From Swiss-Prot:
Protein name per its UniProtKB record: Aminomethyltransferase
UniProt keyword Membrane present: no
Reactions mediated catalytically: N(6)-[(R)-S(8)-aminomethyldihydrolipoyl]-L-lysyl-[protein] + (6S)-5,6,7,8-tetrahydrofolate = N(6)-[(R)-dihydrolipoyl]-L-lysyl-[protein] + (6R)-5,10-methylene-5,6,7,8-tetrahydrofolate + NH4(+)
EC numbers: 2.1.2.10
Amino acid sequence: MNPPVEANIRKTALNATHRQSGAKMVDYSGWDMPVEYPSVGGLMKEHLAVRAGVGLFDVSHMGDIRVHGPEALKAVQYLTMNDASKLNTGQAQYSAMLYPNGTFVDDVIVHKFADDDYLLVINAGTREKDVNWVKDNTRQFKVTVEDLSDQFTQIAIQGPKGVDTLQKLTDVDLSKVKFYWFTRGTVAGLKNVLIARTGYTAEDGFEIYIPSDAATSDRVWNELLQAGKEFGVVPAGLGSRNTLRLEGKLPLYGHEISDEINVWEAGLDRFLKMDKGDFIGRAALEKAKNDGVKRALVGLETIERGIPRDGYKVLDLEGKEIGYVTSGSYMPFLKRNLALAYVPVEQSALDNIVAVEIRNQPVKAKVVPSQFYKRPKKSS
């Protein structure tokens, strides 16, 4: 039984639907959100359903910032580390906003609507901070910044059967929408819906943006559940979203990335375009690279009994603290106890043995490749 929602906690338009479905609700970054659905078997079943079939996630707590105007591209280029000039209209890009010292304000997905119109999708826990950051750092550009966060219900349809599920409700040929591209079309009778082939589960799938009124949101959610019935669809909560993203080494703000971690340390430099011109954090990152990276994000697998959890200490074999676990869990699909952790570079080689302090006891762990899961390539 869930306690009543406190007055100051925010709710998505689907809140009543989650509660009526018996979801276990938690306070997540000030939002009353479903962590799992005991009625479908909870986190483990949800995780496995997304890997094999399809799961539905309410991700309406995420933020949406529109940057538009004659200097929109210049503004986005200055705000983010990837090269938005390479985007075609209808294409999305993983990127990040950085502080002047090269650490993370937040990671973002940049969507290009037009040459003068972009949408930044940001994290729930950093919404207000991010909106203020964008406004404060684009004053020198001819742009308008709009916080659209409360205008949309955002539903993620994730898993290999996500495309088949959504296809039943739309006139858009989804097979023509490539990964990290988006389009607009009719979904469940709603016109002009943003349909993006994106997600946070290391699986194929889509995210749709619909009007944020409760009646519309509830209807579309239930129609998606009905459409996915033959594929074993389940409603899924933040618990399985976390284990799914962890299997795929997708970073989470406050864990793998934060205002104390720079891009080199996080291993996200493949999204860093130093040659595109000036952007916030560029000079500091150049210096950090020349100075040499001192720590690295690695994968760990315990080789003794114990599950590494977020925040646990990483020790060397003499018992000295050398780092910490950013995210860790038993992985339902892989059936392994795995974690991501920051350790000194000299301790980061594959197969190196360290220890994780679990319940005040050192438990041996091996450094393993950090992308634990890669989705299978589709056969032609």
